[in-house]
C-alpha cells in the first residue's frame, strides 16, 4: 500500500522510458513522507485506442489507492506533487490528472494477513 496505477496513451511510452516514468511517480510518492519505500507499488497501463478531447490526444491519468486515514490536505498534496512531476516530464501532453481513493481497512486483505 499504496498503489499508483497509471493509465496513458500508448504514445507516452515513446516519449519516455516506461521504467523511468514508474520511478518518477514512485520517487514523488515516497518524497511526501506518507509511505514506506517498500510499500509503494506503481503500475502502468497503456492504451492503443482512446477518445480524448474528441480525438486521439495523449493523456496520463493516475489512480492512487491509499489506506484510509490520510487527511484531505495530505491527499491534495500528493496529487499536486505527482501531477506537477508528470507535467515537468510531459509538458506537451494536454491531459494529466490524478484521483486518490481510500482503501477501507476493514475490507482490505492481502495474503500476508491470512
Residue ranges and their predicted role:
Residues 2-114:
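A domain-level signal for the structural core that forms small-molecule/cofactor-binding pockets
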Amino acid at each position: 500500500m499504496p498503489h499508483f496505477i497509471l493509465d496513458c496513451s500508448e504514445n507516452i511510452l515513446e516519449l519516455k522510458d516506461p521504467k523511468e516514468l514508474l520511478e518518477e511517480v514512485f520517487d514523488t510518492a515516497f518524497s511526501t513522507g506518507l509511505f514506506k519505500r517498500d510499500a509503494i507499488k506503481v503500475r502502468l497501463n497503456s492504451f492503443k485506442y482512446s477518445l480524448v478531447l474528441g480525438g486521439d490526444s495523449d493523456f496520463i491519468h493516475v489512480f492512487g489507492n491509499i489506506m484510509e486515514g490520510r487527511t484531505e490536505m495530505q491527499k491534495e498534496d500528493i496529487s499536486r506533487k505527482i501531477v506537477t512531476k508528470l507535467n515537468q516530464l510531459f509538458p506537451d501532453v494536454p491531459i494529466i490528472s490524478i484521483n486518490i481513493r481510500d482503501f477501507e481497512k476493514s475490507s482490505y486483505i492481502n495474503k500476508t494477513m491470512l
